[in-house]
Amino acid sequence: LGDVYKRQAYLYDMKKKTSSLLADPMKPILEKIELGKTEPWNFTASDGTVITGKMCLPPNFDPNKKYPMIVYYYGGTTPTTRGISNPYCAQLFASRDYVVYVIQPSGTIGFGQEFSARHVNAWGKRTADDIIEGTKQFCKEHPFVDEKKIGCLGASYGGFMTQYLQTQTDIFAAAVSHAGISDVTSYWGEGYWGYSYNAIAAADSYPWKDPDLFTKQGSLFNADKINTPLLLLHGTVDTNVPIGESIQLFNALKILGKTVEFVTVDGENHFISDYDKRIKWHNSIMAWFARWLQDQPEWWKEMYPERHL
């Protein structure tokens, strides 16, 4: 990636413990980029818990306009602010004229043991309540959001959350799930991380012991409740969440006549690392949201023209 991302170079003085910038080759390019305003936005949930988050506005934001909104939440219960970089960049969506709401719902680590343990043996229920309540409250307090044009996005456990949310609410007009888990049982038995992850997320619970947990919380067993246009993305060699998790939900939704598309990324694992494939993966997400949230289907149709076999 050296030819694509030209990094800053610093000289660090070990004795003085000071650093000085030697080169910043990207500065002329970055100076031309206008970023949207980002600020914290927290709300108090119905149970009294303060749920933290942030909002990111388009660079040329006009409070008198109506904007589509994208809601983003954690993957693997890792805080959305923990990583050095984030493939789901709020500023990227904001640059496309979306309001972005990033939420840290129940189950997120880094907010105390009780808070992080809320998703244990719940697999989405408490977290979904926070996301749905937070989204509704955000819209109530910000009239510039078009409530009929809200999308949601998550990956891994966040992909599971995207799928599960659509079985609980119809407030979203479009949804994107990357490497999501559709059946807790098959993930527990097949996924490279499945058994060890469930040792915490479903502590002391097993399919034969707690069948309701392993079925009722899976979107596959509730596919008939999904009405939101859903995009499934998955690397073909994902060793964390096997690609079958997306395949089986795609098949179920197709049988039910639901609106669903499935994009596979050949040769990629849980994270999309190849640069060119990552660009197409990003564009797939952006095109899907443009289709359903901005009434601009052309991008999607250009990328994935219909084929009649």
Where is each model-derived feature located?
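Structural motif
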Residues: K6-L11
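Active-site-proximal cap/loop segments of hydrolase catalytic domains
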Residues: N86, V102-L309
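Short loop/turn segments that connect beta-strands within beta-propeller blades
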Residues: M14-K17
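Short, small-residue-biased leader/transition segments that mark boundaries at the very start
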Residues: L1-Y5
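N-terminal cap/lid segment of alpha/beta-hydrolase-fold proteins
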Residues: A23-N64
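Short beta-strand element of the alpha/beta-hydrolase
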Residues: K65-G75
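Short amphipathic alpha-helix adjacent to the substrate-entry channel of hydrolases
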Residues: I84-I103
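Serine-hydrolase catalytic-loop signature spanning alpha/beta hydrolases and amidase-signature enzymes
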Residues: T77-P79, V100
